[in-house]
């Protein structure tokens, strides 16, 4: 196991254009991790081919699409609201039962257990687009070849590396939370449940094994793949393509990418998020669709959420600028 967090000097000397120090010295992960990650990535594409073949000439069952949409929304909001805005950044305070429900829903998205996910994301904010960032598209520099390699690394390649993020440093609060630790330990079972439920519901609704299998394909494997690639696109595309209306820290190239706003539940307003990481709303400008923020607002009105960090108009106005903020402080929540 390798923890590749660079010395302070390397981070301070980074010029924002060159490859990260040690970028080519990334040992591969162990065989078991590579195998599991490859299976999670490849199997949904096989499922897509099988599902298209099975539906050829007769179309996709409406129940399969409805189940896929329901599971996509539930698990997606579990990641965006639970893993990200609540547990990583503390954008609001949730009732204990809601914390657990959101953590369970996020775990069913097949993106890693809650402790690892939060630790990696806090590390990403601490070292955004500079040495130490676990999935920056600028890892191999800003030239064309380096940028293409970096996009592949940020989107998916980093999952195959042996670059561990220490939970004890980046998520000690969750490590000490017994409920979150239990949810993390249950991650394999929750992944199994995420695929079993569509199968069982498809069987119950259609009354046939064929209906169960097609529901498993569309609402199980294919739904998982879509959510994963949308999340990974925020890591990769939302640091390269799009607009940067707000000031961020030095070297931070996070962008707003509107085509992904709905599918990502507002996560693709990434520049707004990196400008104000603890804000419960990522779409900081008028007209920016942010379903996750809308759901948090509903939780607040129901009394399930409190201490919500909503945008401060005066502060947002001050953050609007063309130049990045020169700030090298190492704050894991930013």
Roles of regions detected by a PLM:
Residues 76, 162, 261-274:
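Pore-loop/selectivity-filter region of tetrameric P-loop cation channels
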Residues 91, 240-245:
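Helix-loop boundary elements of multi-pass alpha-helical membrane proteins
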Residues 242, 269-280:
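Substrate-binding/catalytic groove segments of enzymes
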Residues 112-116, 256-258, 265, 275:
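Membrane-interface module
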Residues 171-179, 243-269:
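Active-site-proximal inter-transmembrane loops
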Residues 1-232, 237, 279-334:
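Non-catalytic, topology-defining segments of multipass membrane proteins
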């Amino acid at each position: 196991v390798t923890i590749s967090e660079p010395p302070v000097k390397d981070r301070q000397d980074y010029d924002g254009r060159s490859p990260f120090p040690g970028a080519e010295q990334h040992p591969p992960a162990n065989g078991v991790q590579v195998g599991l990650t490859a299976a999670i990535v490849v199997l949904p594409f096989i499922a897509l081919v099988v599902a298209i073949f099975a539906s050829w000439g007769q179309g996709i069952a409406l129940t399969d699409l409805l189940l896929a949409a329901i599971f996509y929304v539930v698990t997606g909001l579990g990641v965006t609201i639970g893993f990200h805005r609540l547990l990583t950044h503390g954008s609001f305070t949730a009732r204990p039962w809601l914390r657990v429900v959101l953590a369970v829903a996020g775990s069913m998205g097949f993106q890693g257990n809650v402790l690892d996910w939060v630790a990696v994301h806090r590390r990403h904010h601490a070292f955004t687009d500079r040495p130490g960032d676990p999935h920056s598209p600028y890892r191999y520099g800003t030239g064309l070849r380096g940028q293409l390699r970096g996009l592949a690394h940020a989107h998916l390649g980093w999952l195959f590396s042996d670059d561990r993020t220490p939970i004890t440093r980046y998520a000690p609060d969750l490590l000490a939370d017994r409920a979150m630790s239990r949810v993390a330990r249950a991650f394999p079972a929750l992944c199994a449940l995420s695929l079993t439920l569509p199968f069982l519901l498809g069987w119950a609704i259609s009354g046939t094994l064929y209906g169960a299998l097609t529901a498993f394909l569309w609402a199980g494997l294919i739904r998982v793949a879509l959510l994963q690639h949308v999340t990974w696109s925020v890591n990769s595309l939302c640091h390269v393509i799009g607009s940067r209306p707000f000031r961020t820290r030095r070297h931070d190239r996070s962008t707003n990418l509107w085509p992904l706003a709905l599918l990502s539940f507002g996560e693709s307003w990434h520049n707004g998020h990196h400008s104000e990481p603890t804000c419960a709303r990522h779409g900081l400008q008028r007209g920016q669709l942010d379903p996750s923020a809308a759901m948090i607002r509903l939780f607040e009105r129901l009394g399930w959420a409190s201490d919500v960090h909503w945008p401060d108009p005066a502060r947002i106005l001050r953050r609007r600028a063309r130049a990045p903020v020169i700030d090298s402080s190492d704050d894991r929540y930013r």
